[in-house]
């Protein structure tokens, strides 16, 4: 029931956010102000993010420490805390909001895929479809040739490709560490996007490797499972402290820190390497980071499926390999 309650609140929250996002993705294009995926060409992302944090963080801190009376007897519904001057929170409007919110969340995912496949905005795609219904539609886009298959990997992919016999796309040359030639949707065809994705992958890989350690070591030391951390730590206060520390650094970094605007430094490896690890270990870092990101997803699904920690599941499996495994859980 506790998880279900949190999921219902999260669904309403993200549904509202997605509906606003749909309007924000379509309306500017209708007004001739550009498509949604070009917004960062006109807006300083780091300054925008910092302003958003400054506005949201105090409100979230107040909300998590008793705002709306949530710490008391839960008199208020977290999705509908009581502010309703137009009397819109009827049973009908609540159901309609959730349905439209779900549609908007799926729509946002569709806009992302549409951008990678057609490189056009939703309005431009709609106009093209109305002009040529038979030639411009999802079937025509899916019919475009995908990367061909060959018997051997092309020159440059020294570690081979992601699947035996697969032919990598032209924009994945094997130049960068752990490039296995996997990009069926040509997401990285744009060099600028590809550069940003490489930096993002290394960043999240490092974060995930730390998170894996933080998820297992405390349990080994008898400090509880990773999903119980919120019982001993004020998550809102911790998040606020982290944002207060990280925001100035991110703002400085986004405005020329490490000389990134001059293109003189690699964003993933800015030069701090006293142990000389950024030579032979970059490939291993990415591979282990990918494994860690997948592992974190596995820990989450494991908890949702069994309600137990990774070490508890491992101990149960060792005690009864036939009766405690993924097949028995799925059954």
From Swiss-Prot:
Keywords: Chloroplast, Photosynthesis, Photosystem I, Plastid. SUPFAM superfamilies: Chlorophyll a-b binding protein. GO terms for cellular component: chloroplast; photosystem I. Pfam families: Chloroa_b-bind. The keyword Mitochondrion does not apply. InterPro entries: Chloro_AB-bd_pln, Chloroa_b-bind. It is found in: Plastid, Chloroplast. Gene3D superfamilies: Chlorophyll a/b binding protein domain. This is Light-harvesting complex I LH35 proteins. It comes from Euglena gracilis.
């Amino acid at each position: 029931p506790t998880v279900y309650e949190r999921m219902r609140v999260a669904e309403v929250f993200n549904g509202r956010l997605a509906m606003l996002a749909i309007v924000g993705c379509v309306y500017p294009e209708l007004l001739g102000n550009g498509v949604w995926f070009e917004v960062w060409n006109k807006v300083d992302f780091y300054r925008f993010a910092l302003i958003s944090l400054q506005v949201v963080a105090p409100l979230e801190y107040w909300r998590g420490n008793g705002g709306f009376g949530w710490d008391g007897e839960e008199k208020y519904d977290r999705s509908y805390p009581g502010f309703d001057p137009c009397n819109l929170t009827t049973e009908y409007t609540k159901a309609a909001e959730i349905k439209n919110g779900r549609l908007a969340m799926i729509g946002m995912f569709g806009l992302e895929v549409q951008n990678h496949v057609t490189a056009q905005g939703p309005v431009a795609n709609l106009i093209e479809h109305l002009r040529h219904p038979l030639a411009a539609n999802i079937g025509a886009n899916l019919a475009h040739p995908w990367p061909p298959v060959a018997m051997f990997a092309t020159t440059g992919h020294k570690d081979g490709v992601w699947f035996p016999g697969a032919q990598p796309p032209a924009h994945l040359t094997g130049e960068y560490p752990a490039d296995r030639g996997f990009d069926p949707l040509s997401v990285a065809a744009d060099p600028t996007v590809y550069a940003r994705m490489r930096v993002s992958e290394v960043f999240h890989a490092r974060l995930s490797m730390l998170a894996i350690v933080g998820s297992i070591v405390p349990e080994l030391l008898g400090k509880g499972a990773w999903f119980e951390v919120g019982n001993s730590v004020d998550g809102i206060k911790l998040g606020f402290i982290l944002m207060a520390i990280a925001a100035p650094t991110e703002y400085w970094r986004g405005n020329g820190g490490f000389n990134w605007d001059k293109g003189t430094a690699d964003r993933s490896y800015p030069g701090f390497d006293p142990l000389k690890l950024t030579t032979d270990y970059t490939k291993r870092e990415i591979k282990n980071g990918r494994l860690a990101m997948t592992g974190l997803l596995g820990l989450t699904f494991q908890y949702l499926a069994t309600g137990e920690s990774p070490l508890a599941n491992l101990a149960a499996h060792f005690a009864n390999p036939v009766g405690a495994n993924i097949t028995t859980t799925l059954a």
